[in-house]
Amino acid sequence: KVEVIVSTLNDFQALALLEALKKVGHTKVSLLGGDTIKTTDMSKGAGLVEGVYATSPILEAKEFTTGRPFLEKYQAAFKKAPAYGGHYTYDSMYVLSAAIQNAKSADPKEITKALRTINGYAPVIGTMTWDEKGEQRYGAVGVYELRGGNWELRMRSDRW
């Protein structure tokens, strides 16, 4: 008996799968996917099966202490919500600026060297740091559940 489907599908593919499962009466199953299903379009899949879950390395701005003020200021300035993951871009600009200042150069190689040694201030998520290979240190993955048409955080890998 299948209880969980682990998927690498995109949202539109996952929705088609959920609709097909409902059509054949196989709804006592949960779908687990990645951030490719953690979209607003997936809200159409709420209630088609017992559960829909997604993991994502992109935590929402509202999940950070300073996230709500960022969202309020952005909404006031641009009259719409930021793009998915936009707070990471916002924070990255602060870190990049600090790296350019530390490198005292606009040379990409010097900036890259500086980025690998920086503990950069990031206004929304706190800090951004990278290892010698360029991988972000201390990143977190969120586990989300689709409930009532909205994605709700269930747990974070940095707080198991």
Task: State each model region's role.
Residues 1-160:
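Extracytosolic ligand-binding ectodomains
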